[in-house]
Amino acid sequence: MNSDKAFVSKIRKKVLISNDFREILITQNTSIIEQRIIMMVLSAIKEQQSLFINVKAFNGKREIQLSFNDYYEGWANQGLVEFSIPLNQINPKQMMKNSAIQEALIQMTNLNWLRLKDETINGFKAVPFILEPSWNSKYIYFKLDKAIMKNLLNMNHYFSLLKDLPNKTSVSNTLRFLLWILKFKKIKQVTKEYGQILKELNIPSNKYEGSYRFDRDFLKRVKVDL
């Protein structure tokens, strides 16, 4: 791992998440450890994300937004981006076993971890979130594909999140539910049928024995965290 070129996670109060990636995480079953790793990635690239935010100039006109191809021109012949994350940022209270963190890294290399739009076939392709994970007693290292970075840097529509949220939640569904409900934040009240909620969260219809069990096993646990 070339540390001079690697993105390093930073201590921040908030991170930015693109709407594209938010939509992916809503339908993805991620563990709390995976969510912490994702937050570390977002903390490392926040300056890069700001380059893609469409800013309104003083004259009322919107400044020309940087394109991803222009940004990536400086990374010629490099299809992968390196990341370096201190273990004590993922496991600050040292309550997790290192083996659990390593298992989460391996899980995130799964080809089916997420699906991205593939314009070349007018469809989707399954891709891992990270590649080539490695670790020692102080750091974890991995790489992100250019296609993943493009998804994370698409700031046409984005949201702000507390970076330490996965450190404070007791269940992994809390972040998932929060990301889902973010799109309704400008609406005072939202009414959804039980089946529609399951569909939007990509939860199998037979996962719970009716809305009562969903409320008991999913919503009530999320409410405790929020």
Predicted features along the sequence, with ranges:
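Charged, alpha-helix-forming regions
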Residues: M1-D225
